[in-house]
């Protein structure tokens, strides 16, 4: 069964997110630093009648990187072609996509860190000088063909910016760090979603739901759908703070946005290793999860909320973790 607090996209959520997607920067809630910079860069590019510099958007899943790419294209008034790193298996796949671009178009590559190196190398000249050289044929009969490209904007999105090669990263003129949402911004998103889908929700309920959504709009919208179900079956259809708390408690989402897996990680650290330090590999084995899963899905939020610290010797549970789970904490 999928974890309800998973920040990766699930089921029909892609369709839901398209329905909720804002069209312009003024409609986009949160990520103000990224928005303010992009507004200037986009207006300047339009005034010069040039393609916008290539843009790299990075940060945890579910924070709106894909939405931002579509908003950028709308602001520029150009077409957007969407693909992803895992889909582009060979250089010829990328060449076919590049060959379809019109002047000023946006090419959006999600999970750009997963591009094969042979494909990435084709991007270098395409991004820098808007041309590619490709080999036609094989063996002695092969020949190089020079293909000019129209000026275009590449928008790359990644959850693993550290996995990008230096040559690729250096070719992005604009970078945007998408951060976890503050409580107020996420509350506004919950209320906007409820309004679009004609759900009746109190401000207190929206605030409580936002508080327990791990700073992530995708999770907030998912929880809102589940809480609506509880409101219809256990209440009068109105989503208030009482039904919200009852629903999220039944879904094992506590007041800090932690679920049973998060709590299992912290309890294991405290009960088996006296709070740590404990290595990530050892911790992963004890909770029966893959190391990469713990590192990518669980740990970032626990660190961001101050429940875990990374040290040279391993992960350490903080006093806040002890207090949250009801353990007595003593300084080591």
Curated annotation (Swiss-Prot):
GO terms for biological process: DNA recombination; DNA repair. Its EC number is 3.6.4.-. It is found in: Cytoplasm. GO terms for cellular component: cytoplasm; Holliday junction resolvase complex. The keyword Lipid metabolism does not apply. ATP binds at residues 20-21, 62, 65-67, 128-130, 171, 181, 218. The RuvA-RuvB-RuvC complex processes Holliday junction (HJ) DNA during genetic recombination and DNA repair, while the RuvA-RuvB complex plays an important role in the rescue of blocked DNA replication forks via replication fork reversal (RFR). RuvA specifically binds to HJ cruciform DNA, conferring on it an open structure. The RuvB hexamer acts as an ATP-dependent pump, pulling dsDNA into and through the RuvAB complex. RuvB forms 2 homohexamers on either side of HJ DNA bound by 1 or 2 RuvA tetramers; 4 subunits per hexamer contact DNA at a time. This is Holliday junction branch migration complex subunit RuvB. The gene is ruvB.
